[in-house]
Amino acid sequence: MFSSLYPLARASLFKMDAEDAHHLTLRALGAAGRTGLACALSARVPDAPRTVMGLTFRNPVGLAAGLDKDGAAIDGLAALGFGFIEVGTVTPRAQPGNPRPRMFRLPQAEALINRMGFNNHGVDQFVKNVQAARYRGILGLNIGKNADTPIERAAEDYLYCLERVYPFASYVTINISSPNTKNLRQLQGAGELDALLAALKDKQQRLADLHGKLVPLALKIAPDLDDEQVKEIGDTLLRHKIEAVIATNTTLSRAAVQGLPHADEAGGLSGRPVFDASNEVIRKLHAEVGSEVPIIGVGGIFSGEDARAKLAAGAALVQLYTGFIYRGPALVSECVKAIARERTA
């Protein structure tokens, strides 16, 4: 039902400020989940099970982190047919993020630019929201560092968040690739990444012993990487036996949107313009890690064929964000069906 109404809703939402529309949609989804009205949103999406990271996904099409930073609308989002949901990024302490305006639509390019800056209510409230959700599917919890934490002490924030979210996560994503937190992408450097992942894997094992379950770790990386950086990241993932990698986050490049309104705004660009760059990173990374580190492909998916292209590049699963905002819940079903056809062809 909601899928058929979404084009009308989008026309109204796109007349609003981008961030105001975002908050309004999240509030509506959150209310639907809390009141049981989520059944009215329920989408008919076929099952297409896939096992990755030792987890069985209802289908391989997930929601990327960033849409629901505080985990406040999990049940409403779950009704839309996603095979898994990822919420966050959350930081140890609440923080407001960057000054507004900080989210911009580029409709001519079917793109968004954001410089949100990990705005969230902090990990304690995040955990309460996750615990309150009735959803029992695969749930990824995405963690980051506070803006005022020195980059040299970033590991402390990640370790703290990992400990807090671990009991409630199907998997935990380590976000080191947002361009909107100063110096964060430095953690993708070989030495910095090696030290961070070593600390996180040690913590993961101790938490697994404590809770009696091993929660997989996924690393989220940027598309703005050269071949040597991709190789170094691949080697580090293999060395530390990280369970998955999410490729990719938003790009700093503006090559595909030059001259468009808002194109010069600072922040990360997502949507169609990042599709090819994301796929290229997926291909190169897959050549390095093979099947040992599953890749979750995200970036510029607007059709079932786009989702299939991610898998052809080497991804095991895909996630939607900007395409979902532009096309609505119908995109979820379209992607699942396209992938299912590919597997039975």
From Swiss-Prot:
Record carries keyword Oxidoreductase: yes
UniProt feature coiled coil, ranges: none
GO terms, biological process: 'de novo' pyrimidine nucleobase biosynthetic process; 'de novo' UMP biosynthetic process
Enzyme Commission number, as recorded: 1.3.5.2
Subcellular location: Cell membrane
InterPro entries, A to Z: Aldolase_TIM (IPR013785), DHO_dehydrogenase (IPR050074), Dihydroorotate_DH_1_2 (IPR012135), Dihydroorotate_DH_2 (IPR005719), Dihydroorotate_DH_cat (IPR005720), Dihydroorotate_DH_CS (IPR001295)
Subunit: Monomer.
Family note: Belongs to the dihydroorotate dehydrogenase family. Type 2 subfamily.
Protein name as it appears in the record: Dihydroorotate dehydrogenase (quinone)
Gene that specifies this protein: pyrD
